[in-house]
From Swiss-Prot:
It comes from Acidovorax ebreus (strain TPSY) (Diaphorobacter sp. (strain TPSY)). Transmembrane segments: none annotated. It holds the Pfam family RuvA_N. The RuvA-RuvB-RuvC complex processes Holliday junction (HJ) DNA during genetic recombination and DNA repair, while the RuvA-RuvB complex plays an important role in the rescue of blocked DNA replication forks via replication fork reversal (RFR). RuvA specifically binds to HJ cruciform DNA, conferring on it an open structure. The RuvB hexamer acts as an ATP-dependent pump, pulling dsDNA into and through the RuvAB complex. HJ branch migration allows RuvC to scan DNA until it finds its consensus sequence, where it cleaves and resolves the cruciform DNA. Gene3D superfamilies: 5' to 3' exonuclease, C-terminal subdomain (1.10.150.20), DNA helicase RuvA subunit, C-terminal domain (1.10.8.10), Nucleic acid-binding proteins (2.40.50.140). Has three domains with a flexible linker between the domains II and III and assumes an 'L' shape. Domain III is highly mobile and contacts RuvB. This is Holliday junction branch migration complex subunit RuvA. Belongs to the RuvA family. The gene is ruvA. It is found in: Cytoplasm. The keyword Nucleotide-binding does not apply. Residues 137-141 are annotated as: Flexible linker. Residues 65-137 are annotated as: Domain II. Residues 1-64 are annotated as: Domain I. Keywords: Cytoplasm, DNA damage, DNA recombination, DNA repair, DNA-binding.
């Protein structure tokens, strides 16, 4: 299996890129979020990859972050979601938005992605719950590190994602961690 490619970016044609690794050119399919974060053609690039072998093709999918690759791996485990659909989901909303939609059980956000209907969205919410990593979900709700710490504390105290996210929204953006926890607990106790 090919887990990572590092080389020179030769071509960028969404959703495909061509990466030269010591004289061998690899065609890699990437999400649009990864595509927009790629360097200019001719510069060095490093992509985490997932190699998919099918009856009629061998495809290499590339990701800018480990979280995006993990989300892709979780998505393709779901019945009815193949690699192309998974890439479309990650292109349409990104990992943080996907994690937030799953934690808040918002099927409407998933339905906005081309190729995802209501039933598929509901299946995604059901099967992805708790699988995208707590840190990704926490960071999805938080605007900054202080808010992420406050949210993590609320989750550790036993509040669910919806309660903690609602309390976080009520806080000023520039609040400190200890003051934010106090204010959030006060609002949750009402």
């Amino acid at each position: 299996m090919i887990g990572k490619l590092t080389g020179t970016l030769l071509e960028k044609n969404p959703p495909e890129v061509l990466v030269d690794c010591h004289g061998v050119g690899y065609e890699v399919l990437v999400s649009m979020s990864t595509f927009y974060n790629l360097p200019a053609v001719g510069e060095r690039v490093s992509l985490l990859t997932q190699f998919i072998v099918r009856e009629d093709a061998q495809l290499l999918y590339g990701f800018g972050t480990a979280q995006e690759r993990q989300a892709f791996r979780e998505l393709i485990k779901i019945s009815g979601v193949g690699p192309r659909t998974a890439l479309s989901i990650l292109s349409g909303m990104g990992v943080a938005d996907l994690a937030q939609a799953v934690s808040l059980q918002e099927a409407g956000r998933l339905v906005k992605v081309p190729g995802i209907g209501k039933k598929t969205a509901e299946r995604l919410l059901l099967e992805l719950k708790g699988k995208l990593g707590a840190d990704v979900g926490v960071r999805a709700h938080a605007a900054n590190d202080n808010q992420a710490d406050i949210l993590q504390a609320l989750l550790a105290l036993g509040y669910n994602d919806k309660e903690a996210a609602a309390a976080l929204k009520a806080l000023p953006a520039d609040v400190g961690v200890s003051e934010g926890i106090k204010l959030a607990l006060k609002s949750l106790s009402k």
